[in-house]
From Swiss-Prot:
<dbReference type="GO" id="GO:0000287">
    <property type="term" value="F:magnesium ion binding"/>
</dbReference>
<dbReference type="GO" id="GO:0008966">
    <property type="term" value="F:phosphoglucosamine mutase activity"/>
</dbReference>
<dbReference type="InterPro" id="IPR036900">
    <property type="entry name" value="A-D-PHexomutase_C_sf"/>
</dbReference>
<dbReference type="InterPro" id="IPR050060">
    <property type="entry name" value="Phosphoglucosamine_mutase"/>
</dbReference>
<protein>
    <recommendedName>
        <fullName>Phosphoglucosamine mutase</fullName>
        <ecNumber>5.4.2.10</ecNumber>
    </recommendedName>
</protein>
<dbReference type="GO" id="GO:0006048">
    <property type="term" value="P:UDP-N-acetylglucosamine biosynthetic process"/>
</dbReference>
<dbReference type="InterPro" id="IPR016055">
    <property type="entry name" value="A-D-PHexomutase_a/b/a-I/II/III"/>
</dbReference>
<dbReference type="InterPro" id="IPR005845">
    <property type="entry name" value="A-D-PHexomutase_a/b/a-II"/>
</dbReference>
<dbReference type="InterPro" id="IPR016066">
    <property type="entry name" value="A-D-PHexomutase_CS"/>
</dbReference>
<dbReference type="Pfam" id="PF02878">
    <property type="entry name" value="PGM_PMM_I"/>
</dbReference>
<dbReference type="Pfam" id="PF00408">
    <property type="entry name" value="PGM_PMM_IV"/>
</dbReference>
<dbReference type="GO" id="GO:0009252">
    <property type="term" value="P:peptidoglycan biosynthetic process"/>
</dbReference>
<dbReference type="InterPro" id="IPR005844">
    <property type="entry name" value="A-D-PHexomutase_a/b/a-I"/>
</dbReference>
<feature type="binding site">
    <location>
        <position position="247"/>
    </location>
    <ligand>
        <name>Mg(2+)</name>
    </ligand>
</feature>
<dbReference type="InterPro" id="IPR005846">
    <property type="entry name" value="A-D-PHexomutase_a/b/a-III"/>
</dbReference>
<keyword id="KW-0413">Isomerase</keyword>
<dbReference type="InterPro" id="IPR006352">
    <property type="entry name" value="GlmM_bact"/>
</dbReference>
C-alpha cells in the first residue's frame, strides 16, 4: 500500500484529509493524465453510491479530469461493479467509483478501474500517488482550447441491468419465486429490484430509500437480521442483502438462516464443477475463510488455494492460476466467466440459478458446508505497528494458539480500509472462540487503541 492508496483505493472521513475536494480534484487530474495519449480523445466514467459527500467529490473529480483535457462521463448512482462493466463495454479509458463500500456515511472513498474493467494495478496507483504528493501536475495542464467536457449518461442503469440479466441462464425462469432484497440504502437500491423483477421474480425490497446519511445504517450485508425476519414473514424463497456499493452479498435461506460468503462459494463451485465450468477445478479463498470451506471443497474433490484478504488479491490468484471462482467470507465473490470484479447482484443471480438447477431450497444447498465456530472482533486502533513487535500481543496470541492446538486457529490483522485491527478465532465451540477472541481483543485495545 502507498501513502494514499490502500487495498481498495483512497478512503477516509469525507471533508477531512485525504477525502477532501482538493484531493479529489488532484486524483482526477492525475488519473486523467495517466490515460492521455496523443491522437486519442480520452474519456473517464464516474459513478457513486448514495452518500451525501458523493456530490462534493464527484464535482471535484470532474473539475480535475476536465482541467487535464479529458472528458468526464457522469453515470450517477450505480454499484461499483456497474462502473467496472460500463468502463469496459463503452471502451472508456478508466472508470472511477466514489464509495466507501460498507463503511458508515461519514466515510467515502475513490477507487479506479482500468479500461478493461479491472482495478488499477499497484504500480499505476503509485504513479498517480507520486504525481499528487510531489506536485507534478501544474506544469502538465493543457491550453484552454484543449480542456475536457463533462457529460451525463442517462441509460447507464439500463445497460447494466441488461448485462446482469444475461448472467442468468436463459432456459431458467424466476416466475413464482419470492425474493426479498435489502439494498442497504445504497447503490443497488434501483438496479437490484429492477433486475429481479425483469427476470420474473416476485420482489419485496427493504432499505431502498437513501437520504445520503442512512447508507448501511442497521441494514445491508453487515446487518441481515431484518432481512431474515422479512423472508420468514413473506414466506419468501430467498433473501439477499447487499452492501453500500453493491460488490458483496449475504444470502438468507427460506428458513431465515443467514449464509456466509464461504457457503455461497461452496454452493456455486459445486454447481460449476458439475457443469464443467470450474476451470482448473480450483477455488481461491482467503486467510479469513472458514475452515469449513476447505473441508467442504476437499469432500467435493475441488482444489483450493489461499491468499491475503482483499478482492484484488483474490483476483490476482484467480488470474495467475486459471480459476473461475474465488472470494471472501464477507460476501465478495468473483465469477470471472461473468465479471472482472466482485458483484453482489451477479452473485445473487448465481445463487438463485443454483437453486433452480439443483431443484432444492437454499437451506438444503447450504448443507454442503459445515460452518466451524468462529468469532470476529474489530478493534479501533490509533497506531499500526507490526503485530510481531508488540510483545504483549504476541504472548496472548501464542497462549490462545497453544490452548486451541489443532482444533482451531487465530488470525490477527489490520484492516486495509479502516483504522482497526481484526481479531478472528476459530475453535471447537462458539463459547471458546468468543472467550479467546475477547482475550486477544482486550490486549489489542490496551496496546494499540
Amino acid at each position: 500500500m502507498g501513502k494514499l492508496f490502500g487495498t481498495d483505493g483512497v478512503r477516509g472521513v469525507a471533508n477531512e484529509y485525504p477525502m477532501t475536494a482538493e484531493m479529489a480534484l488532484n486524483i482526477g487530474r492525475a488519473t486523467a493524465f495517466m490515460f492521455k495519449r496523443e491522437g486519442h480523445n480520452p474519456k473517464i466514467l464516474i459513478g457513486k453510491d448514495t452518500r451525501l459527500s458523493g456530490y462534493m467529490l464527484e464535482n471535484a473529480l470532474v473539475s480535475g479530469i476536465c482541467s487535464m483535457g479529458v472528458n468526464a462521463i457522469l453515470v450517477g448512482v450505480i454499484p461499483t461493479p456497474g462502473i467496472a462493466y460500463l468502463t469496459s463495454s463503452m471502451r472508456a479509458d478508466a472508470g472511477i467509483v466514489i464509495s466507501a463500500s460498507h463503511n458508515p456515511f461519514q466515510d467515502n472513498g475513490i477507487k479506479i478501474f482500468s479500461g478493461d474493467g479491472f482495478k488499477l494495478p499497484d504500480e499505476t496507483e503509485l504513479a498517480i500517488e507520486d504525481m499528487i504528493l510531489n506536485n507534478k501536475m501544474d506544469q502538465l495542464l493543457p491550453r484552454v482550447s484543449e480542456l475536457g467536457k463533462a457529460y451525463r449518461m442517462d441509460d447507464a442503469r439500463g445497460r447494466y441491468i441488461v448485462f446482469l440479466k444475461h448472467t442468468f441462464p436463459r432456459e431458467l425462469s424466476l416466475e413464482g419465486v419470492k425474493v426479498v432484497l435489502d439494498c442497504a440504502n445504497g447503490a443497488t437500491y434501483r438496479v437490484a429490484p429492477e433486475t429481479f423483477y425483469e427476470l420474473g421474480a416476485e420482489v419485496t425490497t427493504l432499505f431502498d430509500d437513501p437520504d445520503g446519511r442512512n447508507i448501511n445504517v442497521n441494514c445491508g450485508s453487515q446487518y441481515p437480521e431484518t432481512l431474515a425476519a422479512e423472508v420468514l414473514k413473506q414466506g419468501a424463497d430467498v433473501g439477499f442483502a447487499f452492501d453500500g456499493d453493491g460488490d458483496r452479498l449475504i444470502a438468507v435461506d427460506e428458513k431465515g438462516n443467514v449464509l456466509t460468503g464461504d457457503q455461497v462459494i461452496a454452493i456455486c463451485a459445486n454447481v460449476m464443477k458439475k457443469e464443467g465450468k470450474l476451470t482448473k477445478n480450483l477455488v481461491v479463498r482467503t486467510v479469513m475463510s472458514n475452515i469449513g470451506l476447505s473441508v467442504a471443497l476437499e469432500k467435493l474433490d475441488i482444489n483450493s488455494i489461499m491468499t491475503k484478504v482483499g478482492d484484488r488479491y483474490v483476483l490476482e490468484e484467480m488470474q495467475a492460476n486459471g480459476s473461475s471462482i474465488g472470494g471472501e467470507d464477507s460476501g465478495h465473490v468473483i465469477f470471472l466467466q461473468h465479471h472482472t470484479t466482485g458483484d453482489g447482484i451477479v452473485t445473487a443471480i448465481q445463487v438463485i440459478a443454483a437453486m433452480k438447477k439443483e431443484g432444492k431450497p437454499l437451506s438444503d444447498l447450504a448443507k454442503i458446508m459445515d460452518v466451524f465456530p468462529q468469532t470476529l472482533i474489530n478493534v479501533d486502533t490509533k497506531s499500526r505497528p507490526e503485530i510481531s513487535t508488540v510483545p504483549e500481543l504476541v504472548a496472548v496470541i501464542k497462549s490462545v494458539e497453544e490452548k486451541l492446538g489443532t482444533s482451531g486457529r487465530v488470525l490477527v490483522r489490520y484492516s486495509g480500509t479502516q483504522n482497526m485491527c481484526r481479531v478472528m478465532v476459530e475453535g471447537p465451540t462458539q463459547e471458546e472462540t468468543l472467550k479467546y477472541c475477547k482475550q486477544i481483543a482486550d490486549v489489542v485495545k490496551e496496546e494499540l487503541g
